[in-house]
Amino acid sequence: GDFLSLKHDARLTEFSVDVHRSDFYMAVLRVVVYQTDKEHKVFTPLLKEPIYIEVFPSGEPQTFSRKISVFVPKGEAWVGIQFVEMRGKDYDRFFFPSTINTCYIRFTDGKIRPLNKRLGIPFSVKGYDYIVVNE
């Protein structure tokens, strides 16, 4: 995943991720959105219901988009994907296109580390600022 620094409250409306190739006969990813503190020690989930992406085998690139509606308070947030389930043979592979942008992994102990020295998994998030205007 990656961190967002928001100057205003925001509403996230769409999440998209590309998969370059999947050999697994079933792979399930989960979209995650957390509010976090500046030190990235505390993560509070913002999605009320889980959003899953089912990836079926294909040697061709695929793009998966999901409509979402998530209110994110101003400050720091973390958006990413988690692997939920992978079914296949021992030699099956799952490929994302990569970027040179930093991508972070959140481990079960809560620690955050960059993935492979500036190797990232690209995804996109659409949304808009949520500003209340007094009349």
Predicted regions span which residues?
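Well-ordered beta-strand positions in beta-sheet-rich domains
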Residues: 1-3, 50, 63-65
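Short, surface-exposed linear segments at secondary-structure transitions and domain or protein termini
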Residues: 54-62, 103-107
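Solvent-exposed serine/threonine-rich low-complexity stretches and specific carbohydrate-binding patches
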Residues: 44-57
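Outer-membrane beta-barrel proteins
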Residues: 19-21, 54, 69
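Residue-level detector of beta-propeller blades
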Residues: 41, 45-46, 114
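Eukaryote-biased detector of low-complexity, proline/serine/threonine-rich segments
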Residues: 70-76
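Exposed aromatic-hydrophobic patches
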Residues: 60-70
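Beta-sheet-rich sandwich/jelly-roll-like modules and their strand-loop junctions
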Residues: 1-37, 76, 82-135
